[in-house]
Amino acid sequence: MGKYFGTDGVRGVANSELTPELAFKIGRFGGYVLTKDKERPKVLVGRDTRVSGHMLEGALVAGLLSIGAEVMRLGVISTPGVSYLTKAMDAEAGVMISASHNPVQDNGIKFFGGDGFKLSDEQENEIEQLMDQPVDQLPRPVGADLGTVNDYFEGGQKYLQFLKQTADEDFTGIHVALDCAHGATSSLATHLFADLDADVSTMGTSPNGLNINDGVGSTHPEALSVFVKEKGADIGLAFDGDGDRLIAVDEKGDIVDGDQIMYICARYLKGEGRLKDNTVVSTVMSNLGFYKALEKQGIKSIQTAVGDRYVVEAMKKDGYNVGGEQSGHLIFLDYNTTGDGMLSAIMLVNTLKATGKTLSELAAEMEKFPQLLVNVKVSDKYKVEENEKVKAVIQEVEKEMNGDGRILVRPSGTEPLVRVMAEAKTKELCDEYVTRITAVVKEEMGIE
């Protein structure tokens, strides 16, 4: 990670860390790096429903105009909507203003290249180097060469038309409960499933600028669980603030996470002959039960570091078409270039319709191992990988597990923490293993 760019673009508290001044620089220098080979580059800009979105959009767009870009403002739209439209409309770049599942005070800015994919580390480093130069030496067009800005709010409808084409058949007879987190999918998802002839009940669809992700959405699926049971829905679909994640709820109100959704869809696509190389790409955080269930179905798996960008990189490299994270970032590369909550929802409902099974029946085919994750505050998180005593206790625990469990000890990507995760046959064993390992981590490098 760089000075400004984290694992998913630039993010911070709006108007305090992510200021309008910084947004202007990101627009100016980021826009230049992505469009410097084009005389009048087209750049699409979308945002979620946060109150700070208008402020940051104005500053970001000003930066883009200062390098001569033709900016098209999409208004409120999901992150995957920006990704799709950037490629579909032959734009040089796309920008999304959102902090995804974070609380309302945060916001963020993430770029997409003309191919619809997120930026590489090299591109982000180039942007940061330009931003930190003592003197701004970028060209400054004047007069007719200055950039222009226009609204293209029809972009959302163009994106919905694309999504509708990914449904194998209409959804007549399926009662869908949606939780849109008072975010970017609030209007889009409701129209999408109604147009596909599903019976639709909604919650989290009344954004006021301040209530995004507040007790709703994919990070709070328990709210949808209650709603599904109240409405008697067949399936609940929870998105996050910018619509790039999906967590589902079955007809009994039980939560179905990203691992389970990936397994369900991958198994169905394999049966249809549509799973490339019979392989799924996931991160090291996926549940051990996920891998065992895939293996049972003759499906191979590849693991990457945590972060959907690393999943996408592995998929692109070897041509795989299904991947994702337990958190609900699910990528179906045949259709879109990034995690897409609404697309994932269609893939899941396609499977329900085709199999005639309930979501609880499909989810039961993957037996999840009990999992426990504990964060330990440390003085230097990177030293954990070299510490001999930590390595020794991990080896000791793994020997006891004898293949019926898994240990993962890694530094956090964003905080001064070491994450200790255990999966085992029982919750009691998870507790025991994590307690033993965290005790050694604290003793060796912990801080109060």
Swiss-Prot record:
Mg(2+) binds at residues 100, 240, 242, 244. GO terms for molecular function: magnesium ion binding; phosphoglucosamine mutase activity; phosphomannomutase activity. The active site is at residue 100. It catalyses: alpha-D-glucosamine 1-phosphate = D-glucosamine 6-phosphate. Pfam families: PGM_PMM_I, PGM_PMM_II, PGM_PMM_III, PGM_PMM_IV. Its cofactor is Mg(2+). GO terms for biological process: carbohydrate metabolic process; peptidoglycan biosynthetic process; UDP-N-acetylglucosamine biosynthetic process. Belongs to the phosphohexose mutase family. Catalyzes the conversion of glucosamine-6-phosphate to glucosamine-1-phosphate. This is Phosphoglucosamine mutase. The gene is glmM.
